[in-house]
A protein has these predicted regions:
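Short acidic, glycine/serine/threonine-rich loops at helix termini
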Residues: 32-34, 70-74, 129-131, 162-165
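Glycine-rich loop at the start of a catalytic domain that most often binds anionic cofactors/ligands
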Residues: 65-80
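Ligand-binding beta-strand-loop-alpha-helix segment within the catalytic cores
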Residues: 76-157
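Short beta-strand segments
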Residues: 21-25, 61-62, 119-120, 152-154, ...
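N-terminal glycine-/serine-/threonine-rich phosphate-binding loop
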Residues: 15-59
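Charged helix-capping and loop-helix junction motifs
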Residues: 38-42, 133-139, 166-174
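Acidic, metal-binding active-site segment of PIN/NYN-like and related structure-specific nucleases
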Residues: 177-188
Length: 188
């Protein structure tokens, strides 16, 4: 059974109009083994088509896959700042790459009539050294959902409370969203 078949079957068997959280893993929507950003458009389109046929509210969190992991690993971004120009440049590149992937996801949703707005993780969230989210933009998600749109967000490089940087994973974001919204269903 494919991820999309499972998602589709579960959405259509549920007639409520409650919030559903979806995590699109980076290795699912990109070729994570690639050293260059490479997306898997078929799966993104499949999910977009499924959502377009639903009247439910959605928050989608996606991973970075090949749009962030290779450069983050190469420059040891999750180990904190090392003061080098190369690492600062790599942080900016990683952020640009995950925003590019977010735009691809948003664009594919838009093509099938699913209106989305993004909550840019590196602009709105901060974590501590144990990956607990300190600043969470619940009001941003609430505004998007109140407009009848799908809220999108993603794993990204964020500031931490020690004036350093860390990678905030999509899984951690999804866990926080689950704690805040207590959704009827969450799909990984």
């Amino acid at each position: 059974i494919t991820h999309c078949t499972f998602l589709c079957a579960n959405l259509y068997n549920d007639m409520t109009n409650e919030l559903i959280l979806i995590k699109l893993g980076g290795s699912l929507i990109t070729n994570k083994k690639s050293s260059q950003p490479e997306w898997r458009i078929e799966l993104i389109r499949d999910v977009a088509n499924i959502i377009s046929k639903s009247d439910k509210k959605f928050i989608i969190v996606h991973g970075a896959g090949s749009y962030g992991h290779p450069i983050a690993k190469k420059y040891k971004i999750n180990e904190g700042l090392d003061g080098s120009y190369e690492q600062k440049k790599a942080i900016n590149t990683a952020r640009m790459q995950v925003r590019e992937l977010n735009e691809i996801v948003r664009s594919e949703m838009d093509k099938v009539g699913v209106e989305c707005e993004s909550v840019i993780t590196s602009n709105t969230m901060e974590i501590d050294n144990e990956d607990n989210i300190l600043n969470f933009p619940k009001s941003d998600f609430d505004k998007i959902l109140s407009k009848g749109k799908v809220a999108l967000t993603f794993g990204d490089v964020v500031k931490n409370n020690k004036n350093d940087v860390r990678i905030l994973s999509g899984d951690t974001i999804l866990l926080k969203l689950s704690q805040i919204y207590n959704p009827k269903k969450t799909f990984f």
